Amino acid sequence: MTIVGSRRSTAYGRRTAEALAAQMAIRGITVVSGLAFSIDGASHRGALEASGDTIAVLSSGVDLIQPASHRRLGERVVREGLLLSEFLPGEPARPHHFPRRNRILAALGGAVVVVEAAEKSGVLITVEHALDLGRDVYAVPGALDAPQSRDATH
């Protein structure tokens, strides 16, 4: 199950992603995400804290865990899960890498769950890829007036 969402999420969104990932992990479902800020990191943490499997797909080489604040989380994923990248070691994350990473995120999950996505969010690229691949896409309801929930609920 791929879990994606806004890098500018609310506390509710992060708690929800972590709890959802933990419940998936408890049920033996591998959690896939991108190791980015907010929803991605919360998803990996939730899966790991539940002693489940998680796959982190990077937009950089596997030796450059970005953001730097997720280095320890990334190291834990290496020990207890799988860190994956199509980019060569030493290659930093670049803006044009994110859509390529999102394609892999969509392909690896049997379905995609969106937890908060602001208008014009890159998350929607993952959703498009998932739909093209015939994957189910689910959106977690957020506060209807929150900007972070705008495209997740429409």
Where are these regions (language model features)?
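Glycine-biased, small-residue-rich flexible motifs in mid-sequence functional cores and linkers
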Residues: 1-154
